[in-house]
């Protein structure tokens, strides 16, 4: 009985020692946490004598009010804490004491990744902060930039990928989370501007897909390859931009024209084909947005390229009834198309003209497709396709007015299509 009592006393003493040690560790973690947030570098240096700089802090839910409740019991590395909360003095102090900027959290994120994910969103509409709130936001932005500089100056890997299914590089993260100001800084510090993620997309692909003109312009200035194709699909930045701009949302928001023109002005190949043989013009014609189609035609998009399934841009245009109602645009496409192929390799006609309301148009187009053109008409088409909209007025200075009018009188078909 006495042995049992002695053993119980020893166990109680051991448990008490463990509890005491745990409470001391918790107190240490809490003090270091608060010192980092307050940028109290003297206290940070003192506490690091008893806490390894690359060991995570674990805080109880009640130990601090800085983090959200869902995050309070999650371990966090001191350097990650300083980066997330944009505390440049604390970040510098930790790095000077051996903090590893490449240490990763449970989601596979480095310090730089976390910086980008937590980058502040501030307005760019003012030049000088005029209110207290604007000054606070400007200070937050400046602290973020300073933290980024400190990280890069201390060897942060600007090409380290996130250790998850996306495999995003820092540049990909900057595009995803809208941190436009850091793109050029990362590129100047060695970030590979043409790096690909797990989906084989470059940062430019991602910027084009969301029609962010500022990002596109910055990436091109930093050396992005405008004609790089996604290996799985063959899509280029131009094709992605046209796809988004031609969508319902793109039409409603009148978005994307500036992005597409920017890509074309910087050498994007207008007739590049994806793995299915589609060009940007195929995509634009399916969307039916006139301003996009006209822009591609201005840059000499070829209306006669066929997909692997034998579908021309005009075939794509005729797929949708909403497109067919724009007779003027249809006539413009017809006047550039030769030969007129209305069916694909399976012999199927476009779905739009199969609707009962378009049966007269269908018959008219079938007749046109079977009617051979004269040599004169073929020559006029070739001239239009070679010189396009871009150079037609230069051509007007060289040709007799009657001849020029006959070449560019592209609305003659309109009455047949009504």
Curated annotation (Swiss-Prot):
Disulfide bridge map: none
ANK repeats (start-end): 27-57, 74-103, 131-160, 166-195, 199-228, 233-272, 276-305, 309-342
Presence of the UniProt keyword Repeat in the record: yes
Keyword Repeat part of the UniProt annotation: yes
InterPro entries given in the database record: Ankyrin_rpt, Ankyrin_rpt-contain_sf
Keywords, ordered alphabetically: ANK repeat, Repeat
Gene Ontology terms: cellular component: nucleoplasm
Protein's UniProt name: Ankyrin repeat domain-containing protein 61
Natural source organism: Rattus norvegicus (Rat)
Gene name tied to this protein: Ankrd61
């Amino acid at each position: 009985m006495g042995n049992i009592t002695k053993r119980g006393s020893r166990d109680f003493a051991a448990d008490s020692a463990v509890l005491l040690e745990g409470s001391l560790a918790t107190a240490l973690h809490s003090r270091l946490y608060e010192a980092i947030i307050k940028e109290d570098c003297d206290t940070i240096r003192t506490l690091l004598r008893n806490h390894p700089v690359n060991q995570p802090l674990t805080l109880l839910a009640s130990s601090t009010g800085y983090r959200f409740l869902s995050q309070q019991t999650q371990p966090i590395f001191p350097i990650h804490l300083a980066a997330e909360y944009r505390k440049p003095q604390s970040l510098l102090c930790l790095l000077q004491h051996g903090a590893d900027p490449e240490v990763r959290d449970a989601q596979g994120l480095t310090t730089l990744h976390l910086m980008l994910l937590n980058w502040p969103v501030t307005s760019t509409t003012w030049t000088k902060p005029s209110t207290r709130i604007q000054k606070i936001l400007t200070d937050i932005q400046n602290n973020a930039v300073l933290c980024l500089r400190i990280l890069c100056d201390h060897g942060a890997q600007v090409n380290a990928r996130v250790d998850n299914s996306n495999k995003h590089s820092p540049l990909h993260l900057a595009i995803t989370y809208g941190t436009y100001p850091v793109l050029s800084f990362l590129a100047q510090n060695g970030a590979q501007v043409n790096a690909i993620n797990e989906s084989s997309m470059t940062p430019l692909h991602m910027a084009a897909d969301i029609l962010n003109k500022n990002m596109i312009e910055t990436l091109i200035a930093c050396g992005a390859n405008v004609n790089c194709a996604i290996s799985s699909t063959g899509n280029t930045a131009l094709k992605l931009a046209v796809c988004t701009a031609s969508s319902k949302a793109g039409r409603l928001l009148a978005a994307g024209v500036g992005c597409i023109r920017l890509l074309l002005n910087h050498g994007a190949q207008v007739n590049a084909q994806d793995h299915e043989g589609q060009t940007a013009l195929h995509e634009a014609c399916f969307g039916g947005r006139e301003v996009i189609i006209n822009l591609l035609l201005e840059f000499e998009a070829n209306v006669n390229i066929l997909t692997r399934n034998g579908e021309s841009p005009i075939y794509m245009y005729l797929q949708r009834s909403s497109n067919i109602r724009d007779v003027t645009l249809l006539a413009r496409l017809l006047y550039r198309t030769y030969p007129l192929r209305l069916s694909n390799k399976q012999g199927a006609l476009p779905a739009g003209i199969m609707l009962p309301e378009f049966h007269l148009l269908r018959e008219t187009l079938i007749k046109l497709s079977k009617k051979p053109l004269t040599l004169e008409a073929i020559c006029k088409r070739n001239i239009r396709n070679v010189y396009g909209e871009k150079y037609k007025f230069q051509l007007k200075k060289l040709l007799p007015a009657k001849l020029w009018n006959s070449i560019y009188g592209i609305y003659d078909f309109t009455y047949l299509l009504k």
